[in-house]
């Protein structure tokens, strides 16, 4: 018997999970690396504050405006192929963004934003397709992974820029995750297939629960998702949360440098405290404690409000509210999309509902950095 055959099912399942989480890491690294480098980038390219704010708004604007198109692309290509498209566009955009000119910075950022827009739909669809029985856990891991990679990028982007320049640092924090994630994605989620690789499904035991939900095809039962009141309630809530998050996270490193005399690296780490622990608490609240959705969302909102209140009243005490709002930010994202996936009867309904919510939320959020700047 080969060594591969002797691996337990849990080990094979973990390989599939790692392949998915590697993809999730790419969804935030290309965007999260820019705020701590914004001062250097703006100085070298001669950008004013408005241009810098516009640059940080480009990906979020893409997430909003391009989501309807991305939804059609995912439906046309399928989940696995669309995920590979995300990785390719992120890599191409990052290389162009680091070319060292203003137009390249904006053009590359648009390409990155367009690619990640597709990925923002792919990730919850993979969870709904392959991990629907552990939705809260996998959505929490998805959100937490995004925030961990942002933490690493913001902590190390400036030190790396001191060695290889901001262009090299910005490119590295996309290229390395993309290449690693791409290798795993090709192995675990082969293009052209609507499920993980068959041999992995069989060895992991996943074949027992990956059923007709894997098919990304239209469903006609019930009203269209955009006619459902619950869809718009979730869209408005997501819009408010993303506006607040991107408004503060887009400029928090710069504000901490100016107001508290922190180093650029220290400011990046402080800003990246937003959202690591929270997502992991979502499966605890939903599954272990069995809290209803209303209680979960109420606790999350209370934690989030601590940050704007503290920044207005006592900005020198930023650490605790940053941690509380970080818990809230990550937890809200995970909780919201857990509800979306659970309430979707198929992967296709998941895609359409997510598209409505993200279009609304990110269009509102895109003006956050400019307004707060």
Please report, for each region that a protein language model flagged, where it lies by residue.
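Juxtamembrane intracellular "pre-TM" segments in multi-pass secondary transporters
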Residues: 2-10, 189-234
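Extracytoplasmic gate region of multi-pass secondary transporters
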Residues: 34-35, 229-272, 279
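Helix-to-loop junctions at the C-terminal end of transmembrane segments
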Residues: 66-78, 280-293
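C-terminal transmembrane helical hairpin of 12-TM major facilitator-type secondary transporters
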Residues: 292-336
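Conserved MFS/SLC helix-loop-helix module at the cytosolic interface between two early adjacent transmembrane helices
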Residues: 65-103
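A late C-terminal transmembrane helix in Major Facilitator Superfamily
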Residues: 347-373
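Helix-loop-helix hairpin linking two adjacent transmembrane segments in secondary transporters
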Residues: 102, 133-134, 141-192
């Amino acid at each position: 018997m080969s060594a591969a055959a002797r691996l337990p099912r849990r080990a094979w399942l973990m390989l599939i999970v790692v392949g998915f989480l590697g993809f999730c890491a790419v969804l935030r690294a290309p965007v999260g690396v820019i705020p701590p480098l914004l001062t250097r980038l703006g100085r070298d390219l001669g950008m004013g504050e408005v241009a810098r704010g516009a640059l940080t708004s480009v990906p979020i604007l893409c997430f909003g405006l391009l989501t309807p198109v991305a939804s059609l692309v995912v439906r046309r290509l399928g989940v696995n192929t669309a995920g590979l498209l995300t990785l390719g566009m992120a890599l191409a955009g990052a290389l162009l963004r680091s070319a060292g000119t203003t137009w390249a910075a904006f053009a590359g950022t648009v390409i990155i934003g367009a690619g990640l827009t597709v990925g923002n739909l792919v990730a919850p669809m993979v969870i709904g397709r392959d991990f629907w029985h552990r939705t809260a856990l996998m959505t929490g891991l998805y959100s937490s992974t995004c925030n961990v990679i942002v933490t690493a990028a913001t902590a190390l982007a400036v030190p790396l820029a001191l060695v290889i320049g901001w262009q090299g640092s910005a490119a590295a924090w996309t290229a390395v995750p993309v290449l690693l994630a791409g290798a795993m994605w090709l192995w675990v989620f082969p293009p052209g297939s609507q499920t993980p690789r068959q041999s992995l499904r069989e060895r992991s035991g996943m074949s027992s629960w990956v059923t007709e939900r894997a098919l990304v095809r239209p469903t006609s039962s019930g009203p269209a998702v955009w006619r459902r009141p619950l869809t718009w309630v979730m869209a408005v809530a997501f819009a408010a949360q993303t506006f607040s998050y991107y408004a503060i996270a887009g400029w928090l490193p710069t504000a901490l440098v100016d107001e508290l005399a922190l180093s650029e690296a220290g400011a990046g780490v402080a800003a990246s405290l937003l959202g690591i622990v929270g997502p992991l608490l979502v499966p605890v609240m939903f599954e272990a404690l069995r809290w209803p959705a209303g209680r979960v969302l109420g606790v999350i909102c209370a934690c989030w409000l601590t940050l704007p209140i503290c920044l207005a009243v006592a900005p020198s005490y930023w650490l605790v509210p940053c941690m509380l709002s970080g818990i809230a930010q990550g937890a809200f994202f995970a909780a919201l999309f857990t509800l979306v996936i659970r309430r979707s009867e198929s992967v296709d309904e998941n895609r359409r509902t997510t598209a409505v919510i993200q279009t609304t939320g990110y269009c509102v959020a895109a003006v956050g950095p400019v307004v707060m700047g």
